[in-house]
Regions:
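Nucleotide-sugar donor-binding catalytic core of glycosyltransferases
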Residues: 1-152, 163-168
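Short helix-start
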Residues: 155-157
Length: 168
């Protein structure tokens, strides 16, 4: 679901449900377990064992931006303008076909993964499969990612080339 599971929503669960597994968890409770959103169905067609192996090659030390603003205007609208001012970031058209998008994910070391319809996004998981490092805003629903290579931030203005390369 794209809906954030809040305390209010969680408290409406029927008593016959002892454990609730969900994406986009926004409330902490023993009976509410966050699970990953995973990759988008259309992206899976481009994913092969060979592609994953090729992703181990050297990557450009840049922050890659490729996302639609309309899926979460509040979290995304300023990001393209802000990061286009830096030589360590690169922006691409969000209408790339899946092959070109997959190639780009594999090419760059860091990928900006702003929240979309939900907090967890397919882009986070596609980035991990491509062997690159997702960069996303910190949230409870993403707490299960703390032991894998993900760069978290509180405010996008905290993201600097030095911070990215220091944290990975």
């Amino acid at each position: 679901t794209d809906t954030l599971i809040t305390k209010k929503i969680y408290n409406k669960k029927p008593s016959c449900i002892s454990q609730w597994y969900s994406v986009n968890v926004g409330y902490k409770d023993e009976g509410l377990i966050p699970i990953p959103l995973g990759i988008a169905n259309e992206y899976e067609k481009n994913l092969s064992e060979n592609e994953i192996t090729q992703n181990a090659v050297s990557k450009e030390d840049k922050l890659y931006l490729n996302f639609r603003e309309n899926t979460s205007y509040k979290h995304r609208h300023k990001l393209y303008d802000y990061f286009s001012n830096f030589d360590w970031s690169i922006s691409r058209n969000p209408d790339l076909d899946n092959n070109d998008y997959s190639t780009d994910l594999s090419r760059y070391k860091f990928v900006l993964c702003p929240w979309g319809n939900g907090v967890d996004t397919h882009r986070i998981w596609e980035t991990l499969y491509s062997g690159s490092v997702p960069v996303t805003k910190q949230h409870l629903t993403l707490s299960t990612l703390k032991d894998i290579p993900v760069v978290f931030y509180e405010n996008y203005k905290e993201i600097t080339y030095k911070e990215l390369t220091y944290n990975t």
